[in-house]
Structure formats: structure tokens, C-alpha cells
Design a protein with these regions (language model features):
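Short, charged helix-to-loop "capping" segments that act as catalytic/coupling loops
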Residues: 12-17, 56-62
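Generic alpha-helix detector with strongest preference for long hydrophobic helices that associate
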Residues: 2, 17, 27, 64-66, ...
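Unchanged
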Residues: 34-61, 67-116
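N-terminal strand-loop-strand
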Residues: 1-31
Length: 116
């Protein structure tokens, strides 16, 4: 089975920070991402998942191609994750209950944090 996910490297341009979401279930930080729904493009899924998890509006930077990671999940599933570079455009009115706590981290400090 192939799983497709999409998300954003959500950037605050003026402060040169990137958003990370805290996941209680795993006790770690991650970039906002999730499953691509049927009939949805990778870009649409990335914007939706970012809004759901952060309550922020993501504007994809079209000049950059998405970063694509292929990996095997712990259950042995083949997963492709499409990560887009995006600018934070402010608060979203998304009412999804999947919202996580977010932190804004300077680019050079991202790898000092427990990431998955």
C-alpha cells in the first residue's frame, strides 16, 4: 500500500523562523503535514493540513519545488511525503480539532529540537 502525505515548511519571513507542531501522542515536534484526501492535489493537501494543525494560512512559494521524502512506516507501508515551502500569511479561521501547539523556531535551531 502506498500512502501519500503533504505539508509545509511554514516560514515567518520577517523573523526568519519556521513553524513546528508539538505532537502529544509522540512527545515530539514535527512539521505540519497529513494525508492527502481523494481528489486533492499535494499542494491543496499541504495548505489544508497546515491550516488544520496550526490555524495559520500558508502561501506556497511556487518558485521552489516540494521536497519529497520516501520512507517505510513502522507498519511496513510505503509513504511519500511532499513538503512545500510556504510563507505564513496570518491566522486561519479553520475550526479543525486537530490543532497542535506550535512553536516558531529560528532556522538554525530546528535540528536542536526533537523532530520526526
Amino acid at each position: 500500500m502506498i500512502i501519500e502525505k503533504a505539508g509545509c515548511f511554514l516560514i515567518r519571513k520577517e523573523t526568519k523562523e519556521i513553524a513546528l507542531v508539538y505532537r502529544d501522542k509522540y512527545n515530539d515536534y514535527s512539521f505540519p503535514k497529513g494525508h492527502v484526501e481523494e481528489g486533492e492535489s499535494f499542494k491543496e493537501a499541504a495548505i489544508r493540513e497546515t491550516a488544520e494543525e496550526t490555524k495559520r494560512i500558508a502561501q506556497i512559494i511556487d518558485e521552489y519545488k516540494p521536497f519529497v521524502e520516501n520512507y517505510t512506516t513502522p507498519r511496513g507501508e510505503n509513504c511519500f511525503c511532499y513538503m512545500f515551502f510556504a510563507i505564513d500569511k496570518g491566522k486561519s479561521d479553520n475550526q479543525c480539532e486537530d490543532t497542535h501547539d506550535i512553536i516558531w523556531t529560528p532556522f538554525d535551531k530546528v535540528y536542536d529540537i526533537s523532530l520526526v
